[in-house]
Structures are given as structure tokens and as C-alpha cells.
Regions:
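Stable alpha-helical structural segments in soluble proteins, enriched in small hydrophobic residues
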Residues: 30-34, 69, 173-181
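Fold-independent oxyanion-binding glycine-rich loops
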Residues: 26-27, 34, 48-49, 56, ...
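Phosphate-handling active-site elements
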Residues: 33-39, 67-77
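Acyltransferase
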Residues: 160-188
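DPxDG-like acidic metal-binding loop motif
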Residues: 46-73
């Protein structure tokens, strides 16, 4: 995804094992379509996890290569926060399938500065996921679909709604990265 003066230009491909071979051509395509060069960017944001080891390695390696070559700062963005960002809600319990009957989860509250973790991101058994007590919360993430038989009976009554289709998304990470750069969180 490309954040350009508040506008997002993005590509979405369900690539599976081919993600590493498609990522750089997609970046090139977005830059070309926007008539902007890599060195003209202010920085590069990437999905810093939690997530699959291979996916994180690809994200970090591509980001490091592009940033080093263009002398740009980078900022990592939480994949769980990107799920929360897609909901449009103010309080979100994000649950992402981690495989092997475990989940990555966190609880986020939106304030004037963006998202604040109420429960820090963690890897846990689905039985360990809890909804914070204060206010109205929604559930989001594919963990509610994959491990719904464990999560839904325990949590559904405490959540205003559940969207089990949401996954980490570059278009949702773009505004999060832009805000992080504005706060001076980029790393050279």
C-alpha cells in the first residue's frame, strides 16, 4: 500500500507461498502508477507481526533492502493493530489464528493519538483471551472463525459484534505507519 498525502493506493493478492515473488513487482507497480520514485518517499512501514515467521522475514528483508537502498527510515506496524484499524470502532479485541490451536491477540482502544494497547499483544491458547471490562468492545480477526468453537461461547456475549473475516492489511497499516512517522518513530 502507498500512503500519498492522505490517500491510499493498495494492491491485495492472496498469494500464499508466492508472496515473496510478487511483493517487489507490486511495490514497483504502485510507485509507477503514482508517478513517484522510491527515494521520494518519506519512509517505509511494514507489518512487524505478530504473524508467520516466514511472512515476517519477508516483510523485514524487503523493507530493509528498499530502505537501505533509498536511505529511508522504517517503522514497524502491528498486524493486530491493522485489524483493529479496519473495524472503524473505538475498542477492539483482535484475535488472529496462530495455528497449532493458539492465537495472537490484543485489546486496543482508540484515542486522539491513535491506538493504545489495553491488553498487550500475546501468543496464547484461545481459552486465555479476555475482553476488557470497561465499555463496548467488538471482536475482530480470523481467530474468531478458525477457533470459534472455543472463543465464541466464552466471549460473544461480552462483544457488541464479531467480524471474523478481517486479516492484517497493508492498506490499514498505511495510516498507522504515517501517524508513527509523524510522531518521529521512524528508525534509520
Amino acid at each position: 500500500a502507498l500512503w500519498l498525502d492522505g490517500q491510499i493506493l493498495a494492491r491485495r493478492v492472496l498469494a500464499g507461498q508466492r508472496h515473496s515473488s510478487l511483493l517487489l513487482p507490486m511495490v514497483d507497480e504502485l510507485l509507477h502508477e503514482s508517478d513517484i520514485g522510491l527515494r521520494q518517499l518519506d519512509g517505509i512501514g511494514y507489518g512487524a507481526g505478530p504473524g508467520s515467521f516466514t511472512g515476517l522475514r519477508i516483510a523485514c528483508a524487503v523493507t530493509q533492502g528498499l530502505a537501505f537502498g533509498a536511505d529511508l527510515p522504517v517503522v514497524g506496524v502491528s498486524t493486530l493493530q491493522s485489524i483493529a484499524e479496519q473495524t472503524g470502532a473505538g475498542q477492539v479485541l483482535t484475535v488472529l489464528d496462530a495455528r497449532m490451536a493458539e492465537v495472537y491477540w490484543a485489546a486496543y482502544q482508540r484515542d486522539a493519538n491513535g491506538w493504545r494497547a489495553v491488553s498487550d499483544p500475546q501468543l496464547a491458547l484461545p481459552e486465555s483471551v479476555v475482553v476488557p471490562e470497561e465499555g463496548e468492545w467488538i471482536g475482530a480477526g480470523n481467530g474468531f472463525a478458525v477457533l470459534g468453537e472455543v472463543l465464541r461461547p466464552r466471549l460473544a456475549a461480552q462483544l457488541a459484534r464479531i467480524d471474523d473475516t478481517l486479516m492484517p492489511d497493508a492498506a490499514a497499516m498505511a495510516p498507522l505507519a504515517a501517524r508513527a512517522f509523524e510522531r518521529g518513530e521512524g528508525v534509520d
